């Protein structure tokens, strides 16, 4: 397990370590040809803010067979011989937004690795190592069967090192400290890297010869994937707006123009609420089952076991949009053991006339059709990811680039003033021109959950 504070170089070290663990293996065939292959390496990415092989907001388990020679935005998803084994849509950029769910996702991915893989495993942790983040980190040391811990940064903080040394000693795991190697070149900020990874993900245009191909056209020029949410061809079971309960009549506005996770549930929707003793065994027994869409039963965790409310879990707005109802004025994420992430999408629009979602996603339409034919339930999960402002302004940036190119060819300066920007903004659904900007009024309000993390046992499931 590789851990350390932000900016310590954990991702770079994991990249180099994975490449070093991919020794070439000669395989002799009857014809005498000896092609070069690689022993696979497991990679558990627990950094939702800057993941290596997925867009921000995902926690994933991968099997690597190819060397990684580029930054994350060059491979926003696993391709070629690399394979994503299982992923969860965390919906946030830091574990601090839901520490319990983060911990349970990590345990689920690790248990999946133990059941299916025998290769070495590299675990890349988040850079949040202070306060509750340190508690989560030490719990991971106790909860995972580690053979070694690498802490990047020999400068501390001292309380972090002391807690890690104690946890490693109790778990009989060696702890190694390495000095961070700072780059002499200027680096992009974390927000810039997230934007580049997200942009790269949504501009993917398939894989050719084991390499990702991209479409450089603005997303506004791409045809969306039209998915019904009502009727006999309904492909989206419901939407989930994580966090505090929202007024359902605003759900279409909350979805349009934002990034959502596409979650697949392997049974009826089981949400991440309060668990009782023995409920984990029940979930393990039910894992892997796929129930038909007609059985919309709601299994909520209560202190006396699994309960089924009469109202059911799925309600509909006035415009017919199905949504998972809140529990205790809050919408909890799905149980990791009974769900997985398919990827992400940008909701281009909600057509309440045809009862369809218009999605921009690199996921092939054949994948949705296959899941629908096998009666798999698909949910759209709205979390707290960055707003894709870059997608709103791509057409404007393209126009400016063409104008500069024409100026270079003709040598004449073109007039491009505020009126031209206003005309462009009038045609955009989520963009407007603000005179002088607004200081702080447009900033999203983020709420931290699970502040009483240590007050509950590690095996307990719950959110505060």
Predicted stretch roles:
Residues 1-8, 12, 16, 20, ...:
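Preference for solvent-exposed, low-hydrophobicity sequence contexts
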Residues 13-16, 105-112, 136:
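Well-ordered alpha-helical segments embedded in enzymatic catalytic cores
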Residues 35-38, 42-121, 128:
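Nucleotide-state-sensitive switch-loop elements of NTP-binding domains
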Residues 30-34, 49-51, 139, 335-336:
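Beta-strand elements of modular eukaryotic interaction domains
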Residues 3-5, 46-49, 56-58, 62-65, ...:
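Structured beta-strand/turn binding interfaces of compact recognition modules in eukaryotic regulators
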Residues 14-15, 54-58, 74-76, 135, ...:
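Short coil/turn segments at secondary-structure boundaries
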Residues 111-112, 116-171:
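Phosphate/Mg2+-binding loops and adjacent switch elements
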């Amino acid at each position: 397990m590789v851990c350390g504070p932000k900016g310590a170089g954990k991702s770079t070290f994991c990249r180099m370590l994975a490449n070093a663990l991919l020794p070439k293996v000669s395989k002799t065939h009857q014809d005498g040809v000896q092609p070069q292959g690689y022993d696979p390496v497991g990679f558990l990415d627990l950094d939702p803010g800057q993941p290596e092989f997925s867009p921000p907001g995902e926690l994933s388990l991968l099997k690597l067979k190819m060397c990684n020679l580029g930054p994350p935005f060059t491979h926003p998803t696993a391709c070629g011989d690399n394979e994503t084994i299982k992923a969860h849509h965390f919906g946030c950029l830091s574990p601090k937004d839901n520490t319990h769910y983060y911990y349970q996702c990590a345990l689920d991915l690790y248990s999946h690795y133990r059941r299916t893989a025998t290769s070495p495993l590299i675990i890349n942790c988040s850079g949040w190592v202070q306060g509750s983040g340190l508690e989560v980190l030490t719990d991971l040391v106790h909860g995972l069967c580690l053979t070694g811990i690498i802490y990047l940064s020999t400068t501390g903080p001292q309380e972090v090192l002391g807690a890690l040394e104690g946890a490693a000693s109790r778990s009989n795991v060696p702890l190694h400290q390495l000095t961070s190697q700072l780059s002499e070149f200027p680096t992009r900020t974390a927000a810039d890297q997230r934007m580049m990874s997200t942009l790269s993900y949504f501009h993917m245009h398939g894989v050719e010869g084991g390499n990702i191909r991209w479409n450089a056209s603005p997303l506004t020029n791409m045809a969306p994937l039209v998915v019904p949410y009502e009727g006999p061809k309904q492909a989206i079971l419901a939407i989930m707006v994580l966090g505090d309960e929202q007024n359902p009549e605003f759900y279409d506005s909350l979805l349009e123009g934002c990034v959502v996770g596409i979650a697949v549930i392997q049974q009826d929707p089981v949400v991440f609420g309060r668990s009782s003793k023995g409920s984990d065994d029940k979930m393990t027994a039910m894992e892997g089952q796929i129930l038909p869409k007609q059985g919309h039963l709601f299994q909520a965790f209560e202190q006396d076991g699994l309960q089924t409310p009469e109202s059911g879990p799925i309600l509909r707005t006035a415009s017919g949009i199905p949504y998972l109802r809140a529990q205790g004025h809050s919408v909890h994420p799905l149980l990791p053991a009974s769900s997985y992430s398919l990827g992400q999408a940008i909701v281009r629009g909600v057509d309440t006339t045809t009862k369809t979602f218009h999605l921009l996603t690199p996921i092939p339409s054949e994948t949705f059709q296959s899941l629908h034919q096998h009666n798999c339930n698909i949910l759209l999960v709205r979390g707290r990811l960055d707003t894709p402002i870059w997608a709103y302004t791509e057409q404007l940036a393209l126009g400016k680039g063409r104008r500069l190119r024409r100026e270079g060819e003709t040598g004449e300066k073109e007039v491009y003033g505020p009126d031209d920007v206003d005309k462009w903004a009038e045609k955009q659904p989520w963009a407007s021109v603000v005179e002088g900007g607004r200081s702080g009024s447009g900033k999203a309000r983020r709420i931290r959950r699970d502040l009483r993390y240590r007050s509950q046992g590690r095996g307990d499931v719950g959110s505060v």
